[in-house]
Each structure stands twice: as structure tokens, then as C-alpha cells.
Amino acid sequence: MPVSGVGWGGRVSSEAGAAGQAEANGYRAGRLRVDGRRDGGSRGGRPWVLGWGPNRLRSFSPLRVGHLEAAVWVAYYQRQWARFLALSVLVVRTAFGMDWIRTVHGAWLVLRANQLWAPPPPKSDPAGARRCMRRFYALLRLTHGEPADPARAAELEVEWWRVHRIHQRGEDGDTQPLVDALSQLYAYTFGLDESALRPAAEYRARAMDLVDQWVTEGRRMDSPLLPPMRAALVRSYAALLAAVHR
């Protein structure tokens, strides 16, 4: 599915750089003080990161996120945008652990990115989709201190959407370009070697093949293709979680 992508995170190069990048992407940085009040970011501090304890970016439930994203995919291909938004709120909250204000804002940005991408070329707006996803990744950076460059993460996100569209239309029957594009996004997000993320990318590509077949066969809700699609997404997230904790 477009975002979700839910593939995410990079490395923070410096505290001043983090604040500057956040402001460049349209959000003001700051710090959370011990007494719970927020300091301004004018002194070059690290982006304001909520005290979740262990990084929630690396402590999600593969079963929960996989099942939620499968439902998001169904809503996307049925163009049920209200349902897509409601489910995206749950995905963003469950997968990324942002506070509720950022969660709702992030889900809205994901919705708009998908709506801009959904029409077939030349009616689609890849640049607009990238702008929305850049702002989404900037929210993620404010929460978790990563990815290092939201604009780069957004480029990689929308790139795999592009590769999937080509694959979906049968212009390229090989899944390797899609696996490569997903691996690159995951590697950038988590700061790991691509080889460690390929199992997660391969399961995700398998899930996409199944949902594409489901679309071709009429998008029936009782289709036997939906359970294995959900299972492939769960396996993808399980492989991703295993890789980032290896």
C-alpha cells in the first residue's frame, strides 16, 4: 500500500541539524523539559521527542499492524476514503506511536498522498504525493528523531509506489525491482543494510501481488485471496521487526 510504507526511520546527524530539518519541512522543533513544559527550539536543540521509553518506531505489533494495513489496502482499492482515513489513524498510531494530534495529522497526510497518487497517469500528482509524505516523515522525525531527511524518505516512499504501479500493470513481471525499492526505503528508514531488510520487502511484495490479483478478480470481500494477503503483511512486519532488533 502506498505509505504506509509503513517503513521508517534513519539516523540523527546532529541536534542542530535535526531542528533545522524539522523547521525546513514546516514544523517547529523544541524540547520537552523534565517538568513537562516545552522549550523552544531556537537554541538548536533536538526535535521535541515524547518520552515513550523504548523507541516505539521499533516496538510495534506485526499482527496488529499487518491486519490493519490489509484493511487499509482494501479501502484504498475500493476508494472508500472515509474508511481509509479512519483506518490510517489506527495504523499510524499503532505502527508509529505518535501522540493523537500528530497521529490524526499524519493520517490525513497519508490520505492526501494516496488520493493524489491514485488516479492513473497523467492525472496523478506524484510531486504532490511526495510533498504530503515529506510532511508525514517530518512529523515522524519530530516524534522519534528520525528519519534523518524527511524529503529523502518521501522520495523513496513514492518511488516504490511508482515501481509497484509498473509491476501492477504487467509492464514488468519481475518482482525484484519492487523488492529493491522497498528494501531501499526500509534501509534508509532504519539505518540498516538492504540485505537485512529483503525478507520483509519480499513478503510485502507477495502481499501486493495477492491484492493486485484480488483487484483483477473483482474485489470480492469473500475472496480467498484476502487471508493470505493479510498473512503476508503480518510476515513482512515480523521480518522487519526481527531485522531492526538483530
Identify the residue ranges that each predicted region occupies:
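Hydrophobic membrane-insertion alpha-helices, especially the h-region
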Residues: 36-47
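Flexible helix-coil transition and linker loops at the boundaries of alpha-helical arrays
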Residues: 57, 95-102, 142-145
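Generic helix N-cap/helix-start motif at coil->alpha-helix transitions
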Residues: 61-69
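Hydrophobic/aromatic side-chain positions at a characteristic register within alpha-helices
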Residues: 76, 117-121
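Short, charge-rich amphipathic alpha-helical segments embedded
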Residues: 89-114
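Extended amphipathic alpha-helical interaction segments
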Residues: 133-217
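A cross-kingdom marker for long, charged
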Residues: 220-246
